[in-house]
Regions:
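ALDH superfamily catalytic-core signature
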Residues: 1-100, 163, 208-210
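Conserved C-terminal structural/oligomerization subdomain of aldehyde/semialdehyde dehydrogenase
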Residues: 40-41, 83, 90-210
């Protein structure tokens, strides 16, 4: 929940697609919806608030248009999908399902409180779906089998992968993506290399053959 909804999903590395194995999909979805429903919209300065507004009105309007477009092309709204009728640019927490590859929404980034939910039969199908994206900043895999998590992480085409944690940024962790999510890294030991001019110095013996 936090992976999708921190800052109301208005971050580049917030979770966008939730890809779940069929064997646990119903149980996951029920718990996911129940947890999302507990969010309390309000003034971000109020400690009781757990759901803030969109950054600006135009962002809300654009997001609502994206959801309507997804539905027009066959997606189903499992919860939310509308504006919250209260002062401010608030949107209902939303889950979209049945978003097929030919749906324009499949290729879009929903920059707000909208999660796309996918069911898959097995690990290979999950990885193929995860990699079928124009973006590749970060991702997460949750599993009791850490070795399996490492295997999946190595096959997902992103700049960052987190096992049993949400995608996160920290000054000590190199940050960056692949594909349309950019190139290069900032932060961490890799990030400092962006500010270093590297020099080659080769030493030969004075009497070595030319």
């Amino acid at each position: 929940v936090w992976g999708r909804m921190y800052n109301q999903g208005q971050t580049c590395c917030a979770s966008k697609r939730f890809i779940v194995l069929d064997s646990i999909a119903d149980k996951f979805l029920a718990k996911f919806q129940a947890a999302l429903a507990l969010q309390e919209p309000g003034d971000p300065m109020d400690e009781k608030t757990t759901k803030g507004p969109m950054s600006q009105e135009v962002a809300l309007v654009d997001l609502l248009k994206q959801v309507d477009g997804a539905v027009a092309h066959g997606a189903k709204v499992l919860m939310g999908g509308k504006r919250i009728e209260r002062p401010g640019s608030f949107m209902e927490t939303t889950i979209l399902a049945d978003v097929k590859p030919d749906n324009p929404a499949f290729r879009q980034e929903f920059f707000g409180p909208v999660a796309m939910f996918f069911r898959v039969k097995n690990e290979d199908e999950a990885i193929a779906l995860a990699n079928d994206s124009d973006f590749g900043l970060g991702g997460s895999v949750f599993t009791k089998d850490v070795a399996r998590g490492e295997r999946v992480a190595s096959r997902v085409n992103t700049g960052m992968m987190f096992i049993n944690n949400i995608d996160w940024a920290d000054a000590e962790l190199p940050f960056g993506g692949v594909k349309d999510s950019g190139y290069g890294r900032e932060l961490g030991d890799m990030g400092i290399q962006q500010f270093v001019n590297k020099k080659l110095v080769r030493v030969n013996a004075i009497d070595a053959p030319a």
